[in-house]
Amino acid sequence: MRRDVNGVTKSRFEMFSNSDEAVINKKLPKELLLRIFSFLDVVTLCRCAQVSRAWNVLALDGSNWQRIDLFDFQRDIEGRVVENISKRCGGFLRKLSLRGCLGVGDNALRTFAQNCRNIEVLNLNGCTKTTDATCTSLSKFCSKLRHLDLASCTSITNMSLKALSEGCPLLEQLNISWCDQVTKDGIQALVRGCGGLKALFLKGCTQLEDEALKYIGAHCPELVTLNLQTCLQITDEGLITICRGCHKLQSLCASGCSNITDAILNALGQNCPRLRILEVARCSQLTDVGFTTLARNCHELEKMDLEECVQITDSTLIQLSIHCPRLQVLSLSHCELITDDGIRHLGNGACAHDQLEVIELDNCPLITDASLEHLKSCHSLERIELYDCQQITRAGIKRLRTHLPNIKVHAYFAPVTPPPSVGGSRQRFCRCCIIL
């Protein structure tokens, strides 16, 4: 808030007179002022630091800078800024996000690692100047590191994973998505020193083979989350070892791993009863047989992405409706064998009334307005995708809205085709995206 005083615009912080500030400082002990300042964000702290010398000292006290997120300032953050922050915060800093800060490189992060040895959570997602040298620094100075995000740091190699293994034994969560130089050798080195890993994001690590998963399955019994999206070389052999070695697994993304078959679903059903999230989009070899085993054994499923699992039929939906009462999000996009009958079972199932929030049915050509009738009793339903469902009508959507007035319906409808022009030119036809 800014106020005009004698023609001069001043911020609320600048409106404090010396006497006002002196009263506050006199009435409240330093410890209490520090406690108040600890609730302020980075921008507000910097503003407070400009009020007076006393507040400058309080605002810039290292204890107020335990958690810093610089994403909103990513274009302005250069290495020297990180170095200055590290010198000011020192051992107080526990969590730092430099996501998207393209100007930050190895030298600045070495200074940071030397000064902030109690760091526990570090996000370097998209810091493309980062190389193995940064992980070497973290290994040398930051032994308390628990969460590290190196996604899209494409210069990272197996050497980084070896360094982390040697110096960061408490590591629980690591994201090296799109670090496509990483191979099974790096994974082997990592898991031997970081056996407490709970979350591992390997999306787009296209060189990884089944051997890498065997190392994970053998050394990471605490693993809860694993993302293998578009790891194209992965097969049943590798994923089965994960299922057998990681019984606490709750979230698995294998979207784009087109080599996997029902053997994976059987292994998950037999070994991972706590599974909550399964993403297997574009895994076209999966069938009703595998999903039947999965549904009958994994009753805690909450989110399933089955996009382009083109072999599944209503049988899968029947099993989910019976055995998965917690299901909240279900994607069936491009599952062209799904019919109104499957949606009827889902709408009458255990998850329907209080749990189901999102269902994606785009490009399911057999779905009609009858499916919308079956879903009207799903009172928690927030969004439904109906793009390119040619048998869905505006009238059907309108009827659904009478029962679920707050639902977001996404659908395509072709506009009315205009009459031929007098000049006889070729008729044009367009499809418009209408967000209903």
UniProtKB/Swiss-Prot annotation:
Ranges occupied by LRR repeats = 74-100, 101-126, 127-152, 153-178, 179-204, 205-230, 231-256, 257-282, 283-308, 309-334, 335-363, 364-388, 389-414
Which SUPFAM superfamilies does the UniProt record give? RNI-like (SSF52047)
Any one Gene Ontology BP term: regulation of protein catabolic process at presynapse, modulating synaptic transmission
Subcellular locations according to the entry: Cytoplasm
UniProt KW Repeat keyword: yes
> Where does it primarily localize?
cytoplasm
Q: Which GO terms describe its cellular component?
A: cytosol; glutamatergic synapse; presynapse; SCF ubiquitin ligase complex; Schaffer collateral - CA1 synapse
The keyword Cytoplasm appears for this protein: yes
Ordered alphabetically, the record's keywords are: Cytoplasm, Leucine-rich repeat, Phosphoprotein, Repeat, Ubl conjugation pathway
Alphabetical list of InterPro entries matching this protein: F-box_dom, Leu-rich_rpt, Leu-rich_rpt_Cys-con_subtyp, LRR_dom_sf
A Pfam family of the record is: F-box-like
Sequence positions bearing Phosphothreonine: 417
Residue numbers of Phosphoserine PTMs: 421
Tell me which residues make up the F-box domain: 22-68
> Could you describe the subunit structure of this protein?
Interacts with SKP1 and CUL1.
Q: What does this protein do?
A: Substrate-recognition component of the SCF (SKP1-CUL1-F-box protein)-type E3 ubiquitin ligase complex. Role in neural transmission.
Please name the PANTHER family in this protein's record.
F-BOX PROTEIN YLR352W, PARTNER OF PAIRED, ISOFORM B-RELATED
Q: What is this protein called?
A: F-box/LRR-repeat protein 20
**Annotated organism of origin:** Homo sapiens (Human)
What broad taxonomic lineage does this protein's source fall under? Eukaryota, Metazoa, Chordata, Craniata, Vertebrata
Q: What gene does this protein come from? A: FBXL20
